[in-house]
């Protein structure tokens, strides 16, 4: 948690002038090649070294016409949970509309509850600042290429159709716990081979990280926890492994 808080302070205090001059801004909404209709499922959550499950992810997706609603809830053995909902317009592109992010501690107490209105350019709700409730009513231009929660894997799955110089950039709303609008990039790192159930898999390797500008990025990337996706190519591509932090508190987790 201290690590993530230090990053937030660094971003706020040290980057203001640099970002305005040198930031690499995201482009238009990503082009959609792969997106399913109505699906649901559950996946065990493992610790960073594997072993016994420490929780479970529940996923629900419902599509009606050109609108899709995705809900992902991560429940942990200690009683804590992370919940993200996103509604987006999907036709030829992925255009975010609205959503909600909720983080609860092991006692079920809400630490973060944010509602995101992309067309209206508002983020409302509250977060806990070391036990003090802070109300949020943030007015910010949010373009349709603002993605969070379950929308991010949609970006990864459609990487090839949108990559420029092996990168795809977009904006996100990140609870730190205070909500911050960040530019993120998915970068292709090459291929990885793993063995699973006696089968050799050649997977595409991606990383997700914030980007502020070429001067600052090397410093930030050394500080932030690594978030990685291993994706099996196919029609559509499928997630073989996710490794990274569950939220701003930095607890590492693994999905396979």
Predicted regions and their residues:
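Generic hydrophobic, helix-prone segments enriched in Leu/Val/Ile
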Residues: 16, 59-61, 96, 152-161, ...
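Surface-exposed beta-loop interaction hotspot
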Residues: 123-170
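Bacterial N-terminal signal peptides
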Residues: 8-17
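Residue-level recognition of conserved structural "scaffold" positions that shape functional pockets
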Residues: 21-23, 138, 155-156, 205
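Bacterial N-terminal signal peptides that target proteins for export
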Residues: 1-9
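Acidic, serine/threonine-rich low-complexity disordered tracts
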Residues: 22-120, 166-256
